[in-house]
Each structure stands twice: as C-alpha cells, then as structure tokens.
Amino acid sequence: MAALHTLWMGLVLLGVLGVLQTQAQVQVSLQPNFQQDKFLGRWFTSGLASNSSWFREKKKVLSMCVSVVAPSADGGLNLTSTFLRKEQCETRTLLLRPAGTPGCYSYTSPHWGSTHDVWVAMTDYDEYALLYTTGTKGLGQDFHMATLYSRTQTPRAEIKEKFTTFAKTQGFTEDAIVFLPQTDKCMEEHK
C-alpha cells in the first residue's frame, strides 16, 4: 500500500511539474499599454528565429518580406504579407483575432488548421516590433517563432541586437536566428 501511495504521489508531482513547465514556456511579456492603432501600417520582416524544421531547412533561401497591418471588423488585425516564393510574389492574409490582453492575438494556420498565438512583446511603433508566436504544427509538433518587424529595410544595429537578445531569452540558439537579406522583389506590393 505504501508503494502504491508513493507511486501516486510521484505521478501527481510529475503532473504538477509538467503543468508548471508548460506555463513557463509561454510566458512572454507584452508591450505595456499596447496601442493597436499605432501598430498599423507597413512593416518589413527583418529577422526570424524558430524551432521549426521547415525554418532550419529554408532559412538560407529566405529573404525579407513586406507586411501591412490593418484593422479588421472584429477589432483584430488583418496581416497581409507579400514574399518571394519560387521566383514569384505570393501574398497571404491572416486574421489576427484579439486574445484577451491588448497585444495578444490568435490566428488559424491556413496550412495546418491549427491555432497559433501571437504576442507583441515590444515595440516603439515607429521603428521596430518584436513578436513571439507559438502553436502546434502537424502532429503535436510545438512551433515557436520570434519575429523582428522594422519600418525600414535596414534596421539599425541596436535593433538587431535587441532582437537577438529577445530571441535568446525565448530559448532560441544563435544558429536559429537569422536576419533576412533585402530584396527589391515583391517590396512594391504594399506601398
């Protein structure tokens, strides 16, 4: 009986530790007093970090893309991104639905059908924004990504360093962080 009690207590403790560990993984600070109206407009995706196998395979061929953030009818955001894919410009729009605290959104992945959460962790609205995205991709594969948005195609070195520090704080290693090269292709789509 004592062995059964000890086993049960061990399982309970493992469960509690598992819950605590899961909660700790998603603790991303949000931009204090996030102002959605100031976040609207044109952004360049200048930096990425991800644990995704797709990202690791493709990161050397990725290039900067342009995104436009506009208000949606439900109080969320329409995020329309145009990027180069197979030598052609491709445009995709995501509906970011408000998910509680201002600066926190969720969207459904058109490819996987899964729900992803997006946090605007830090922004000055005029120069840069740091975002963190998490979700499940495919069969139980956790997906995490940090993104650097810049209002220009040439973010300052201090902004790049801020992004690197942010990405490492989220658990990404140096080799999982990439600054996307500029391209003239597909950049005129959202002027």
UniProtKB/Swiss-Prot annotation:
Cellular compartment(s): Rough endoplasmic reticulum; Nucleus membrane; Golgi apparatus; Cytoplasm, Perinuclear region
Cysteines joined through disulfide linkages: C89-C186
Subcellular location, principal: endoplasmic reticulum
Signal peptide (UniProt feature, chain positions): 1-24
The keyword tRNA-binding appears for this protein: no
The protein's name in its UniProt record: Prostaglandin-H2 D-isomerase
Catalytic reactions on record: prostaglandin H2 = prostaglandin D2
GO cellular component, one term: rough endoplasmic reticulum
UniProt GO BP: mast cell degranulation; prostaglandin biosynthetic process; regulation of circadian sleep/wake cycle, sleep
Oligomer and partners: Monomer.
